Structure formats: structure tokens, C-alpha cells
């Protein structure tokens, strides 16, 4: 019997071709920080063609980046409506209030802060709020820390917001008024901090401090009992010193958020240099 051996050649199946292409594509992808040229390429492409399927967009734009990398770069940094710089007093108060209701639901919280991303808010909470709780030797989710926010820090933030709003009304200059840039939830939060009492808004810082001290003393007597080493009043004074490292007086000519010296922007003078700014956080991504 004559046997005919046929010479066959191996043709890669479609699955193998896709796998080889994926390996080649993965090897060509860029890693690490984005360059200015890459940013401009992504901005110009989206400006001309709009957003779409990010993997296809990355290839069409000629970017050697993953679709996920392009999406995060656009949403968290390059979008025209993304805000820059530190959070305003209104934004910080709103974050504290909404987090007390919804917890770590960053996307839901971000819906009430125009121009702020969920990733940015999460980084603020972790690098500012959680670090301050650690400085006070208490858990960020503990009743002790939540009481400090509710009865001391949030009312103080609300006072600064009202003081600035009054300064803007007196001067007639609304160019720096950020109240209109934040959801109406902010004003409801401010009102809740004052329990609807106009006298609370116009009272001096010392009067407000006395009222808050009495409220916090009642709360912490329940928490600490008869602990002689750290009674509620001593602890309240300790955290208040951390919150307002220096006394801040409203200035009608120039009332800017960077004057919020204490816990709101840097907790205390000794700690402010070790805390990351939003610019530093962006650079780390």
C-alpha cells in the first residue's frame, strides 16, 4: 500500500492571533505618569470625537495607554469642570455631613460636590480626617470622634461660612463667593449646625465655644464615665486645640479659605507640613 504523506503547515487559529496581538500590545503600553503631550492628545481627541469606549478611544487617539488609564486620567484630572486646589469650607462641611449619613459612598457624596471626583473626596477623607483621628488616638468611626465633628468642628466650619457670606454681602463683591458653587445641601447643613437659631450665627467665638463645650461635656460623660485621667472637658479642650491651633478673626476685606488654619486645612501648625495637598495626591496617581 502506498502511503502519501502530506506536508501540512500550521496556521494559527484566531484565538492564538488575538493572544499574540494582546501580548505585543501589552508590551508596547506605557506605564507611569502621564506626559503633557499625552494629556493634550487625549484632550484634543475627546474634544473632536467625544467620549466613547475607552479601549477603542485609546487606540484611535494613538495613545499607548490602557482604556482604563485614559478613562481615569480624563475623569479625575483633565475634564474641564474638575476643580483644582484645596476643598473650600463649604465643601469640607458637606463632606463631613454626607459621610455621617452615607459612610464611604464616595460616588454618591461626589454628586453633591460639582467638579469634585469620588476619588478626590476619598483621598481627602483618608489623608485629612483619618489622620487627624489617629492624632487624637481614636478611631475615625468611634462615637468619640463623631461627637467631636458634630458638636465642635462642624459648627465652627458653619460659623466661618456665615462670616464670609456676611462679609461678601457687606462688600457687594460676589466674585469669591463659593456658596453658589455647592449643592443646596450645604446651607441645610449650616442651618442644622445652628439649630435654626439666629443668635448662634451672630454670637462671638467664645460664646459659641461655651455652648459647644456644654454639649460635648454631656456627650463625653456618657462615653468616658468617671475617668480621672481624661474627663470630657479635658478631652474637649485637647481636640479643640488641635482643631483651631490659632484663633482666627473674620476679615471683611479678605476672608479666604486658607485662613482656616486648624483641623480643616491642616489640623495644626505642627502637622500641616506632613499632610498631602490635592496636587501631591494627583502626582501620586
From Swiss-Prot:
Induction: Induced by jasmonate (JA), wounding and infection by the fungal pathogen Magnaporthe oryzae. CDD domains: SANT (cd00167). GO terms for molecular function: DNA-binding transcription factor activity; sequence-specific DNA binding. One of its GO terms (biological process) is regulation of DNA-templated transcription. Pfam families: Myb_DNA-binding (PF00249). Residues 54-78, 106-129 bind DNA. It is found in: Nucleus. Its main location: nucleus. Residues 26-78, 79-133 form the HTH myb-type domain. Keywords: DNA-binding, Nucleus, Plant defense, Repeat, Transcription, Transcription regulation. Signal peptide: none annotated. One of its GO terms (cellular component) is nucleus. It comes from the Eukaryota. Probable transcription factor that may be involved in the jasmonate-dependent defense responses to the rice blast fungus Magnaporthe oryzae. Does not seem to function in the salicylic acid-dependent signaling pathway. This is Transcription factor JAMYB. It comes from Oryza sativa subsp. japonica. The lineage of its organism: Eukaryota, Viridiplantae, Streptophyta, Embryophyta, Tracheophyta.
Amino acid at each position: 500500500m502506498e502511503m502519501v504523506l502530506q506536508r501540512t503547515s500550521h496556521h494559527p487559529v484566531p484565538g492564538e492571533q488575538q493572544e499574540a496581538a494582546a501580548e505585543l500590545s501589552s508590551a508596547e503600553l506605557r506605564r507611569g505618569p502621564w506626559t503633557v503631550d499625552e494629556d493634550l492628545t487625549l484632550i484634543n481627541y475627546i474634544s473632536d470625537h467625544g467620549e466613547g469606549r475607552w479601549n477603542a478611544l485609546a487606540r484611535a487617539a494613538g495613545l499607548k495607554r490602557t482604556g482604563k488609564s485614559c478613562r481615569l486620567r480624563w475623569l479625575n484630572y483633565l475634564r474641564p469642570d474638575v476643580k483644582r486646589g484645596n476643598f473650600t469650607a463649604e465643601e469640607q462641611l458637606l463632606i463631613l455631613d454626607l459621610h455621617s449619613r452615607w459612610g464611604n459612598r464616595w460616588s454618591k457624596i461626589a454628586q453633591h460636590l460639582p467638579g469634585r471626583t469620588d476619588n478626590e473626596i476619598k483621598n481627602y477623607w483618608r489623608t485629612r480626617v483619618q489622620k487627624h483621628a489617629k492624632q487624637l488616638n481614636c478611631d475615625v468611626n468611634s462615637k468619640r470622634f463623631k461627637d467631636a465633628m458634630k458638636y465642635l468642628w462642624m459648627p465652627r466650619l458653619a460659623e466661618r461660612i456665615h462670616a464670609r457670606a456676611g462679609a461678601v454681602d457687606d462688600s457687594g463683591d460676589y466674585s469669591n463667593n463659593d456658596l453658589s458653587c455647592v449643592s443646596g445641601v450645604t446651607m441645610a447643613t449650616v442651618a442644622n449646625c445652628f439649630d435654626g437659631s439666629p443668635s448662634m450665627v451672630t454670637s462671638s467665638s467664645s460664646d459659641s465655644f461655651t455652648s459647644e463645650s456644654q454639649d460635648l461635656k454631656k456627650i463625653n460623660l456618657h462615653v468616658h464615665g468617671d475617668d480621672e485621667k481624661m474627663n470630657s472637658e479635658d478631652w474637649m479642650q485637647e481636640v479643640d486645640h488641635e482643631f483651631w491651633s490659632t484663633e482666627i478673626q473674620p476679615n471683611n476685606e479678605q476672608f479666604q479659605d486658607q485662613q482656616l488654619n486648624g483641623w480643616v486645612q491642616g489640623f495644626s501648625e505642627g502637622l500641616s507640613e506632613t499632610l498631602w495637598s490635592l496636587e501631591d495626591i494627583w502626582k501620586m496617581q
